[in-house]
């Protein structure tokens, strides 16, 4: 339970709470600047997340389709400095779990995508088809992180955006950070400490975020105290 899934799941549920009615459609979008330093496991997980088949929620059913048949030319505007960014759709575990959350029980459609600064979009089809190429690129990125971080043109920026909609309203939840490491570590630590302190009632077992009864406003205040500031736009 770190950045995705974890913090992104919280942002989906927090946006849904502001909507105040059942969510029918949802989107998760993440922007990674090329200067953001990430761990080896995080890099591998990111590249392995967009294999040749794409998992998404469509008409309330989990489907697997070829990425070329699903909005291959779609773009997204994160903010005024990051507009019309081409997207790489990926299979988040939240596709399988989000409907467990009470406000998402009637969810019809949900997909997840990210933009990685400076990644040539022309190489994406090859990455999807070849495990060897994915592993090769992962090794290259991991080895060159120091150089990428020093390059002033590479942004040290992570932007997380969740959208939820119903027939009448749209709510956007937005977060800016300079470190995916920090987002992952802080969210995980906050959840564990909240459980230890008794703020989150939980039985022994294995649970996803959607399974846990959490006061979302309380959790948001704790995150604010850790300088993780999430904004809401309605």
Language-model region placement:
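Short alpha-helices
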Residues: 1-16
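C-terminal catalytic/substrate-binding lobe primarily of soluble NAD(P)-dependent oxidoreductases
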Residues: 14-234
